[in-house]
């Protein structure tokens, strides 16, 4: 059997691995900045266009609705043409959407902003499918969640930079009621996208193929993963991601309104600044999560964080004054690891379905399209504080997914607190099952052995038991 075309992260030299990791990680900063500005524009447009909180969530509907529509297509595109071309397409759409913010601001058209945001969302959906999937498979599955948390930590850095910029230039002086600053900020964002596109064109980014990934998991005794519709961990991961992202986006969309309405004398400018501090808390939590995920099983840690998110979201909806503000900061901290953990747990060991599965999980970001609208309707009808009951449902769904994975693992192989290298465990099982050689032909699903067929059947059963 000829070796599979392409490579895997574990086959790269240390230098090429570090280069690929750093280059793809730069993409996380790109969409973190755009996302950080989005929630601030939500409040800014309420003032400039004299629209309600519910109407302002059209931005979230366009941005996250683009993920729902475009992410599956992006996964299919990269399955055929590879990660690098997918990154080029994503950066191109991202820059194009940002450029159209200029005429929208110039002619004061809220609909233009909504349309431009949709195009940006399509670009970022493509980048998320590429970057999240690439980082997840760029090495051992044991550290996939830690790697993705580290890379997405830079998304958090950019996320608090957006509100910080807004607090200085969107809400002060004449900028509080105009869009002059918005158009220049987004022209700079478009320029950043163009520069990154040029850098990726001239850089040698190693292509990690699904054939190579399939061969890698075959080497440790994992049989054919079966059709895509049977990848229940991935399908339920999409449900969990849809619910979680919807909750996260709803929480962030009304932070400025929530802080101003708390009755403790917080202005819009000060609220935007505090929002950036919330994002700093989120980012710090993500880097702390990198350390924790080296030692604690990702599904178990996600279960704990999901329960904490549920509790503090309820706290935000009920507590008044600075008590609610404190619960809000805690909520941002415990949100930190959720998205990367759901992604890596849902796409683990998919083999030939890796890119398609990545597209499905990223499609879950579309949950951010309708949660803010539901929350905005409740905020208009009751209060911003009470509207934070809406995200609670999303955190509960995410927690059930994580707890389900923990229970499933406990039933099959016993309860596991520590994070373990499953590939190493399976290789050891294969070696024990085949003492004559313990080796697989590279890229094959049969073993070199002189063991009689009757003994081989028992050995294969041992391997399949470890797979469970």
Where do the model's predicted regions map?
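Conserved MFS/SLC helix-loop-helix module at the cytosolic interface between two early adjacent transmembrane helices
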Residues: 69-111
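Cytosolic juxtamembrane N-terminal segment immediately preceding the first transmembrane helix
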Residues: 1-31, 47, 226
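Extracytoplasmic gate region of multi-pass secondary transporters
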Residues: 38-42, 163, 167, 226-276
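Central cavity-lining transmembrane alpha-helices of secondary-active solute carriers
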Residues: 58-76, 276-288
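Extracytoplasmic
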Residues: 19-51, 131-132, 162-166, 251-259
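Intracellular juxtamembrane helix-capping segments at the cytosolic ends
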Residues: 126-143, 336-352, 357-359
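Helix-loop-helix hairpin linking two adjacent transmembrane segments in secondary transporters
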Residues: 141-208
């Amino acid at each position: 059997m000829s070796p599979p075309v392409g490579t895997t992260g574990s086959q790269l030299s240390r230098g090429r691995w570090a280069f690929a990791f750093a280059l793809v990680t730069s993409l996380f900063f790109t969409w973190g900045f755009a996302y950080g500005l989005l929630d601030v524009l939500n409040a800014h447009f309420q003032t400039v266009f004299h629209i309600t909180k519910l109407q302002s969530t059209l931005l979230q509907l366009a941005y996250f609705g683009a993920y729902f529509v475009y992410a599956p297509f992006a996964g299919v595109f990269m399955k055929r043409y590879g990660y690098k071309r997918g990154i080029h397409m994503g950066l191109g759409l991202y820059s194009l959407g940002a450029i159209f913010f200029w005429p929208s601001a110039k002619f004061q058209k809220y609909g233009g902003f909504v349309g431009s945001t949709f195009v940006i969302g399509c670009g970022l959906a493509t980048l998320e499918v590429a970057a999240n999937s690439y980082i997840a498979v760029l090495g051992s599955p044991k550290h996939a969640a830690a790697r993705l948390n580290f890379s997405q930590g830079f998304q958090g850095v950019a996320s608090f930079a957006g509100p910080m910029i807004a607090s200085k230039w969107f809400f002060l002086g004449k900028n509080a009621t105009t869009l002059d600053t918005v158009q220049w900020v987004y022209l700079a964002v478009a320029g950043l996208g163009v520069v990154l596109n040029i850098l990726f064109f001239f850089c040698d980014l190693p292509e990690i193929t699904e054939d190579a990934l399939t061969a890698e998991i075959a080497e440790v005794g994992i049989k054919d993963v079966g059709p895509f519709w049977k990848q229940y961990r991935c399908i339920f991961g999409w449900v969990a991601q849809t619910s979680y992202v919807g909750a996260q986006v709803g929480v962030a969309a009304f932070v400025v309104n929530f802080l101003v309405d708390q009755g403790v004398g917080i202005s819009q400018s000060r609220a935007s600044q505090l929002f950036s501090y919330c994002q700093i808390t989120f980012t710090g939590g993500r880097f702390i999560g990198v350390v924790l995920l080296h030692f604690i099983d990702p599904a178990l840690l996600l279960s704990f964080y999901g329960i904490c998110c549920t509790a503090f979201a309820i706290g935000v909806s009920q507590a008044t004054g600075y008590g609610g503000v404190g619960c809000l900061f805690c909520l941002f901290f415990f949100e930190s690891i959720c998205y990367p953990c759901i992604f890596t747990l849902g796409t683990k060991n998919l083999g030939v379905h890796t890119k398609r599965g990545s597209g499905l999980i990223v499609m879950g970001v579309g949950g951010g399209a309708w949660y803010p609208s539901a929350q905005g309707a409740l905020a208009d009808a009751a209060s911003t504080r009470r509207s934070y009951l809406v995200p609670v449902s999303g955190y509960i769904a995410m927690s059930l997914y994580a707890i389900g994975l923990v229970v499933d693992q406990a039933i099959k192989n016993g309860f596991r607190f520590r994070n373990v290298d499953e590939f190493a465990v399976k290789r050891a099982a294969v070696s024990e099952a085949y003492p004559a050689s313990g080796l697989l032909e590279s890229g094959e699903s049969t073993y070199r052995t002189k063991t009689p067929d009757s003994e081989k059947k028992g050995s294969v059963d041992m391997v399949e038991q470890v797979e469970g």
